Amino acid sequence: LAENAATVAGFLVEPIQGEAGVYVPSEGYLSGAKALCERYNALFIADEVQTGVARTGKRLAVDHENVKPDILVLGKAISGGVYPVSAVLADDRIMHVIKAGQHGSTFGGNPLAAAVAIEALQVVKDEQLAENAARLGEIFRKEIGDYIKISKIATLVRGKGLLNAVVINDTEESDTAWNICLKMRDNG
């Protein structure tokens, strides 16, 4: 970053890499990246579409390291799955760079979506869903870890809160992992 600071506008990161296999970064990675962004005047942009709103055992995944992103991207869980909602959040220092008429969106400013998101976030708070995800995630990883010790089916479990991955001992050509997913679906 030091060599190219003049050409880097920001650093976009999923606090926990989701689709690639639920990879949790080493402790201090996010706070270190945020510090580098501050040092070189680059925006720290957190993509919390998959990790945000209580899923990882905190309100946001960046909260595990007390990192405040310059820009926060949310979706999916912000409405509790009730209504399609997404948001890009930043403070005035960032948002006021965009002048009226410079940016538009197809469904922007939807009052129903905003009301649904507000209520869903209140439920997350009132029902302590982040704390529940942290507790249940610990139980899940312990139980799967114990199962791994006695089974040859799974080899590893990783994650935070209720965002987890279980690595299946299989080949790429096999359908074992898919069949396990179908069995889990069929059994609730």
Predicted regions and their residues:
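Conserved N-terminal phosphate-binding loop of PLP-dependent enzymes in the Aspartate aminotransferase
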Residues: L1-G188
